[in-house]
Amino acid sequence: MAKISKIEAQKRKGRYNIYLDGKYAFPVAESVLIQFRLMKGTELDEKQIAAIATADQQAKAYSRMLDYLSYQMRTESDIVKKLKEIDTPEEFVESILKKLRGQQLIDDHAYAASYVRTMINTDLKGPGVIRQHLRQKGIGENDIDDALTQFTPEVQAELAKKLAEKLFRRYRNQPERRREQKVQQGLMTKGFSSSVYEMIKDEVVPQPDLEQENDLLAKEAAKQWRRVRCYQGYEREQHFKQAMYRKGFDLDDVQSWLDAQDFQ
């Protein structure tokens, strides 16, 4: 048996050094000090010292998680990953999670709701992308579904309109059909369904600028016609039309351009 001869506070808050029989023995957290009722004069055997060391290891891991949580909200999955990163014994993980839950320091339902609320107020992402992010964070489907109820049809329409207007400006130098395709693709990439675009398109699709469209077509047509010069007659026209269609131009407009040319 060894006897505690001194308990000394470390510079780090909540940590103490334990001295046995006049010699430094080991450090402990304040919670461990209380848990084992350690005080000057307490006698400890090897089994008790081992139990104290195990408890302190768990206390340090818990303290690390408190630091980790101090910067932002975390999911249970985040905590588990972090505990593994710092080589926390597997048997400590569930008890640490239970303690954090009990103190309401982790709550996946609240995390999901907060994340969705933040995205609605600060970003132009749709529910599809947000659902995927929350899944990657280890959030359960029920918690995700509850959080996404904030994405009412009205909220989706408002965000989608802002994003669509931004995308239409970005692709303003594209042919009308290609521009609209790009906007639809952009909305879907950001997590909005095709039905949302159908709901808002009458409000966001710009009025056609015929002069600009004609200029774009004429410029691109001249370039593509040169590119297919290795073909002759009908075959050249077919390759030309295919190239123009891939670029987003209407085939009737392409034919009109062809009809207006004098290739003699």
Curated annotation (Swiss-Prot):
Its main location: cytoplasm. It is found in: Cytoplasm. Keywords: Cytoplasm. One of its GO terms (cellular component) is cytoplasm. GO terms for biological process: regulation of DNA repair. InterPro entries: RecX_HTH_1st, RecX_HTH_2nd, RecX_HTH_3rd, Regulatory_RecX, WH-like_DNA-bd_sf. Belongs to the RecX family. Modulates RecA activity. This is Regulatory protein RecX. It comes from Limosilactobacillus reuteri (strain DSM 20016) (Lactobacillus reuteri).
